[in-house]
């Protein structure tokens, strides 16, 4: 009976999601732009690790191969949330995005503050896990705001900003350091850690927002 009720509820949730999608005659552009902006920022912030970990490791006089280990752990952590996504959402519920953004920020601060190898491993894992947690949620929301015939187009726009962030990340950080005369291997991590902390605070205050929050349909069964 319990299994039957769970199956029925999952079916009802699927019907609701489909009806939300069918109500859209065109792509909801304001929501799409906000999702693109959010995806751009978290990609830009998280990729600080892939671009600048090697410089930090070298500055800390750690083995050069350790930066490769950190980057590998970062991408491994991105994959991990997808394996237990429902459980994670069940734990954090409407605060899922807040928690994910906070993880990215905490990971960056681990790089910017600590010199210990263990904390750098924790930082790479936290940042990757938080980023990997937000990715599927952004993709799912993107599909919802477009009619079925335009869902692929909407997703292509969101995916495009992912690659745009990859391309612009080092240029944006280098431009900031030149303009502010702030230098050092820790600066990129501290800068983006502070920006991410600000976004986490905004997500907490706007946790009922479509972009920064998470609808109850994701975790109510």
Describe the predicted segments one by one.
Residues 188-221:
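Multi-pass alpha-helical transporter architecture, strongest
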Residues 1-23, 211-220:
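Flexible cytoplasmic inter-helical loops of multi-pass small-molecule transporters
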Residues 80-93, 177-178:
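Helix-to-loop junctions at the C-terminal end of transmembrane segments
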């Amino acid at each position: 009976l319990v299994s039957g009720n769970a199956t029925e509820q999952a079916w009802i949730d699927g019907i609701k999601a489909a009806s939300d999608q069918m109500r859209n005659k065109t792509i909801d552009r304001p929501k799409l732009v906000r999702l693109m902006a959010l995806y751009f920022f978290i990609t830009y912030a998280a990729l600080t690790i892939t671009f600048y970990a090697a410089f930090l490791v070298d500055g800390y006089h750690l083995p050069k191969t350790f930066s490769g280990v950190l980057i590998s752990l970062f991408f491994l952590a991105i994959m991990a949330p997808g394996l237990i996504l429902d459980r994670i959402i069940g734990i954090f519920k409407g605060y899922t995005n807040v928690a994910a953004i906070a993880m990215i920020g905490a990971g960056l601060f681990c790089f910017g503050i600590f010199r210990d190898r263990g904390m750098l491993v924790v930082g790479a894992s936290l940042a990757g896990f938080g980023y990997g947690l937000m990715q599927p949620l952004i993709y799912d929301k993107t599909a919802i705001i477009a009619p079925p015939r335009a869902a692929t187009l909407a997703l292509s726009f969101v995916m495009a900003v992912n690659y745009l962030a990859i391309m612009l990340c080092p240029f944006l950080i280098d431009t900031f350091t030149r303009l502010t005369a702030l230098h050092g291997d820790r600066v990129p991590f501290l800068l983006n850690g502070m920006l991410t902390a600000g976004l986490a605070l905004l997500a907490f205050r706007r946790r009922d927002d479509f972009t920064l929050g998470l609808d109850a349909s994701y975790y109510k069964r």
